[in-house]
Amino acid sequence: MNIVFLDRDTLSPQTRLRTPGFAHTLTSHGRTALHEVAARIADADIVLVNKVRLDATALAAAPRLRCIAVAATGTDTIDLAACRARGITVSNIRHYAVHTVPEHTFALIFALRRSICAYRDAVQAGRWQAAQQFCFFD
């Protein structure tokens, strides 16, 4: 089984990939330009991808391809209709960041409501230190 990762550098170096429980070869490319895709996946059974676009033309160059694993939540870079027509399974990381995205959203709401960025800028500019009283009112 031939596995090709087209853009390994889009993941953190600390991210460890699980070793499949079957005989395989893994070829990892740091990045892949669009003109390199067809040649790199020509003999692939499985393609791992994050940001590289896989369109019908690229997929046609990979007759053995049976699975595309997207290392992200979105599949907008994959021609899903072409995959369906060729019997290629596409999987992605579902439920990724289901807690962190809403937490970050609320953190941004609070930061906006309390003018955190404006106060940070004022402190960095020395305005708090120059205030006549201990509290800094703006």
Name what the model sees in each region:
Residues D76-I88:
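Rossmann-fold NAD(P)-binding glycine/threonine-rich loop
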Residues M1-A44:
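N-terminal glycine-/charge-rich "phosphate-binding" loop or analogous flexible N-terminal tail
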